Amino acid sequence: MNKNVKINNPMKVITGPNTRWSYANVWEPKSINGGTPKYSVSLIISKSDTKTIAKIEAAIEAAYKEGEAKLKGNGKSVPALSVIKTPLRDGDMERPDDPAYANAYFVNANAISAPGIVDADRNPILTRSEVYSGVYGRASISFYAFNSSGNKGIACGLNNLQKIRDGEPLGGKASAESDFASDEDGTGKSQSLPRLHQGCRWESHHRSRASGGGKAHLP
């Protein structure tokens, strides 16, 4: 086989360059509700980016078909895709009070292993303050089926990130704990917690010190 030939994975998606990163906990894994520490990011995709949306919908469908046996479990039939949890969510419906999510869909992605992070020229980004909630870039993500204690759905795994440009640092009203508590493997229930995303707090402090002051990125 030619080593240069890429094997197409229908469950893998590279988002468009205008995808915005929110709750970017990508430098250190974080444990949520006592679970396995993971890296995570909320990917905000404009509804006008129909190409990326279509690719994600197709990948979710592929993950559903590939995971039918897992989704069926001990049941008599495979549940319909329309009745299980899926990761592509409507920002206008779920985040009506957050301008960053207006006219956009979003996908929460996470991983146990650290994502590779590069710049627009594909050089590794080593300075943590360069990546924060609010930047724009591509994300390499993969979709897969899960069935945990009867909680069934399609989840999104985070592979790699490519920062394209800076953006206005984002604030956040919902916590990362709330967003990711039940999305990855169906364990636990989402709860609205008052504390902020620790990765964003660290980044805010780091950037504040680097600039000699300034406002934190999250209220």
Task: Name what the model sees in each region.
Residues 1-7, 168-219:
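Acidic, gly/ser/pro-rich intrinsically disordered tails
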Residues 106-120:
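Short, basic/aromatic beta-hairpin or loop at an interaction surface
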Residues 42-44, 108-110, 140-142, 162:
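Residue-level recognition of well-ordered beta-strand positions that form the cores
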Residues 1-106:
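OB-fold ssDNA-binding interfaces and closely related basic DNA-contact patches used
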Residues 52, 114-116, 163-171, 200-203:
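A broad, structure-centric signal for solvent-exposed, well-ordered loop/edge residues
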Residues 118-192:
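Compact mixed alphabeta submodule
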